[in-house]
Regions:
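Charged, low-complexity intrinsically disordered terminal segments
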Residues: 1-248
Length: 248
């Protein structure tokens, strides 16, 4: 966790045009305070800041952002939006939530993975102990796909109509030559796409597959794809938590 936030904050400090952030929740703790202070400083420099969070994710976490936090952030130039605000009768949409975790900085650098904004990724939790999660930093053409994923949700919630071409990009830096697939699952639109991506990747594997998942509940089709890979001689490594924050 510490490495992710250190790299993220350093990249934010270098931002010149815009910073887009999307998380299931921003927990109101020491990490969020440091992040928002930094974002406010960048906004003061003229950098456009847009941040999106899931309303259910915010309300369900132990230290949610409250109206006074959002008002203060708006006054400091940090534009915040909620994904699918919880309204009565909430049962109709409570399960279609936004779990995307995306940061895009100037169209050059992107972050995605499993971490929200919270200091327990560094400090752990008393009831769980140390917390391990995965996050990746991306440069190169793949960042554009993270941008599209963010803008799709942002525009849906704000009706702003911001297009990728309206986002000021400098020339994208060249990639490393490694292949990266950005797969966006949208509830009610393409619910099967993530499973299909897993199966395609497993069926294409030649040497090794590494899976890290805190809630490993693969469907029958995914289990069969794992079995096929193993039967071909592919080494399959699966990491799951010894102790989970969710009982299932």
């Amino acid at each position: 966790g510490r490495s992710k936030f250190e790299h993220l904050f350093e990249d934010i400090k270098k931002a010149e045009n815009y910073i887009h952030l999307e998380y299931f929740n921003f927990r109101s703790d020491s990490i969020a305070k440091e992040l928002f202070t930094l974002l406010a400083e960048k906004a003061k420099e003229g950098v456009t800041i847009k941040a999106l969070f899931d309303d259910f994710g915010n309300l369900s976490n132990s230290r949610p952002l409250r109206k006074e936090h959002l008002k203060m952030l708006a006054e400091r130039g940090v534009e915040m939006a909620r994904f699918s605000p919880i309204r009565f009768p909430y049962i109709n949409h409570v399960f279609c939530r936004d779990h995307q975790k995306i940061v895009v900085i100037d169209g050059k650098v992107g972050y995605t993975g499993g971490m929200n904004i919270a200091d327990y990724y560094i400090n752990g939790l008393p009831e769980i102990g140390p917390w391990r999660d995965m996050h990746i930093r991306i440069e190169g053409p793949a960042v554009q796909y993270l941008e599209k994923a963010f803008l799709g949700v942002w525009n849906k919630e704000t009706h702003e109509g911001l297009k990728e071409g309206q986002v000021p990009h400098d020339t994208l830096c060249e990639g490393s030559g490694r292949r990266v697939a950005i797969v966006q699952r949208i509830p009610k639109v393409c619910p099967e796409i993530m499973r299909e991506a897993y199966i395609a990747a497993l069926d294409a594997a030649e040497r090794k597959v590494q899976i890290i998942n805190p809630y490993f509940t693969p469907t029958r089709k995914v289990r069969n794809a794992i079995k096929r890979a193993a039967e071909r001689g592919v080494r399959v490594e699966i990491m799951i938590p010894g102790k989970s924050d969710i009982s299932f």
